[in-house]
């Protein structure tokens, strides 16, 4: 007797295959183009508060944008196709979403390790609140989803602050980086809204899977295009 695969599983497998195909395309770009490295810096203590000399800053890490995108896609593909692993959907989202926004912050010129860690942590907290919503009986103004939404806005506020500050200082983010930022922001908000509708019983999980996969894949394509044009 043949067992049919649930629509959610079929959508997840299709998403995994798409991620793998795009990972191969991005790998080809990374191998043939110059790398884009995102700096991670740390301000060392030692300067006197109020002194004119700033605290010494050093670069202790560089993140290869292309390789990071490839790893995100491969990990997403594994989690999407390994639907028999309990909670694979949330394991994937819990890692991919924070790292994606971390990379976007780096593209917007945020290099301070403290800011980057805060962005990653707050985005992870948003995903954890969404996971908690799975056990909640209802959606309300104080439900885990609502609290997660409020927390999840903060990283985008930090990124927006740096974009505005860079523009006022005469060093605005490149137009293409602004497009990437706005695209991922809109799609991330859409995926969160789809999850809310899913928990409210107004739609199915396929919509959330489709939007979250579109976010990852479109970010990867835009990052590859940025590498090509760099």
Predicted regions and their residues:
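Polytopic alpha-helical membrane-helix bundles and their juxtamembrane interface segments
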Residues: 2-88, 92, 97-230
């Amino acid at each position: 007797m043949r067992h049919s695969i649930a629509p959610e599983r079929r959508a997840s497998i299709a998403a995994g295959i798409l991620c793998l195909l795009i990972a191969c395309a991005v790998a080809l770009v990374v191998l043939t183009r110059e790398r884009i490295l995102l700096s991670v810096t740390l301000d060392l203590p030692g300067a006197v508060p109020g002194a004119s000399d700033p605290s010494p800053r050093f670069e202790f890490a560089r993140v290869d944008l292309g390789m990071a995108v490839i790893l995100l896609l491969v990990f997403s593909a594994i989690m999407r196709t390994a639907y028999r692993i309990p909670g694979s959907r949330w394991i994937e989202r819990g890692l991919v979403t924070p790292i994606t926004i971390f990379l976007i912050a780096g593209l917007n010129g945020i290099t301070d390790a403290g800011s980057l860690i805060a962005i990653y942590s707050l985005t992870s907290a948003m995903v954890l609140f969404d996971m908690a919503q799975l056990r909640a009986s209802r959606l309300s103004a104080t439900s885990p989803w609502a609290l997660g939404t409020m927390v999840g806005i903060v990283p985008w506020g930090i990124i927006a602050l740096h974009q505005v500050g860079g523009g006022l200082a005469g060093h605005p983010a490149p137009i293409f980086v602004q497009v990437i930022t706005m695209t991922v922001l809109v799609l991330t908000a859409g995926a969160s809204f789809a999850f809310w509708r899913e928990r409210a019983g107004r739609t199915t999980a396929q919509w959330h899977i489709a939007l979250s996969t579109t976010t990852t894949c479109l970010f990867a394509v835009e990052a590859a295009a940025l590498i090509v044009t760099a």
